[in-house]
Amino acid sequence: EMGKLLYMTDFEYCKYNFQAMRLNHLVIECNYCKELVDKTAENYTHRLKGHCSLDTCKILVKTNHTAALRTVTLVHLSNEAADPEQILKEIKEAVVWDDALVQIARPGLEVNLDLCPF
């Protein structure tokens, strides 16, 4: 059994709180770091309105974090406006339970979604 998984991508903000569900796995977009977004880019408004920032991702992780959380997999990072090392560091800081695995999705990544890892 894998438990409960929340998958969220292509959103600016999420007004819902899933903490009562005691999620086990988060697969969540972390598309850009605000300071890296090119304000003159043609897709500037779309990036802000149609994608999740690092700041929003951190809030969502903190808001929905419980001791049941086992994995946080970050997806849909921008090639131009994301710093994977910064994102990983800041999301790891948002996850207060040390045993939750935080990682960035890459081609070929396999994530163990078993509820019990043993």
Q: What is each model feature region?
A:
Residues 1-22, 113-118:
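Core dinuclear metal-dependent hydrolase active-site scaffold
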Residues 105-115:
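A short, charged, Gly/Pro-tolerant segment at domain boundaries
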Residues 19-107:
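Cap/insert and terminal regions of metallo-dependent hydrolase folds
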